[in-house]
Amino acid sequence: MQKRITIFDTVRGFTMLSMAGFHACYDLAYLYGWNMPWFTGTIFQDIWRASISWVFLFIAGWMCTLSRNNVKRAAKYAAAALIVWIATTLVSVDDSVNFGIIYCMAACTAVVALTRSLLQKIPSSWGIATCLVLFALTWGIPKAVYPLPYLAWLGFPGPGFVSGDYYPLIPFVFMYLTGFFTACAAQIANFETP
């Protein structure tokens, strides 16, 4: 059995608790009509949401460097995303989850699985810097509506597209790859330390 990396398990655990708290507040405010202006009327909700999803994506990107089989990992994420989509479509309490965070992790893991040999040729510091810049530059892309059908998965939602949790490949692949390149940098630093 592989040794666990405690810091990642700890951060993931706290992030899972934060996610549970976020979803509880979301449900209370939007499904049950509780008056929560600190959650619904400020930027706090966006910051809280980002603190959860960005941590998950960064850590998942890091874990790609430790995985023996990223294709299998991507397939597991994709199966979980499909189950979430089916469940949220059938229950219809809120908008169904189309291209949510688990889908995003599946797609990003598949990207790394397919391009890892190329990614490993990029100096880690350049990869980190480039991905953070691209993340910032492409942040607004999925916030617009495009006259292109069937590209919401990539980050170009068309008219009529709705999702209860939307994390398309663009821009979030760049946060995922930031985790990947940071792991590569840490592994090189660890290897070079006497």
Task: Give short role names for the model-derived ranges.
Residues M1-P194:
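Alpha-helical transmembrane segments and their immediate juxtamembrane cytosolic regions
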